[in-house]
């Protein structure tokens, strides 16, 4: 049975989620020693801007890019905020796109600093969500 981490990276006009995903994947490799799958709607951007992406991502799933009508406020500090498009609907398809039998779906801005998340694989449940964070 394979285990791995699935990251979604769908950039908007201001946030490079692919860059975040690459950093996140480097931490996953260091602390969890798990394969990482990147699901993105801009494969060409990944290939052009991150030439060494295969070091970080074991699998790539190309998502269809759809027009987005969703907008979200992003806050950067106390006095700065921007309302930007938010491409997050594909996460609902995580079970359909993951190449792993057991998958941790992780936000790209999560910074891993230990192997605590590996405990998630000890549970025989179809869906787990953290009630408290450490």
Model-predicted segments: where are they?
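Glycosyltransferase catalytic domains, chiefly GT-A lineage
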Residues: 1-134
